[in-house]
């Protein structure tokens, strides 16, 4: 879905979505200068909103996402190479 619909579905502004993209919290596909958001973006957005509801700052959320993605990378390496 496009950025305006993604923002509407998640009841946040388009500027907020762009800010999350700039921080690397959401990584949508980009085609011809337009962002497209899939189910992975939606899951990440739901996590962001939940962490914010719990009182985490965006920097803390960014760190949590880093650890989450690092864990996936380590699992991939274990499954691939060992």
Question: Predicted regions: what is each one?
Answer:
Residues 2-8, 27, 39-82:
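Arg/Lys-rich, alpha-helical DNA-contact motif
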Residues 6, 13-16:
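Short glycine/proline-centered loop/turn elements that form peptide/ligand docking sites
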Residues 17-18, 48:
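Short, hydrophobic-biased segments on the C-terminal half of alpha helices
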Residues 20, 37:
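Conserved active-site tyrosine of GNAT-family acetyltransferases
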Residues 24:
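Glycine-centered, phosphate/nucleic-acid-interacting loop/turn motifs that mediate DNA/RNA or nucleotide
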Residues 30-35:
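Short, Lys/Arg-rich nucleic-acid/phosphate-binding segment
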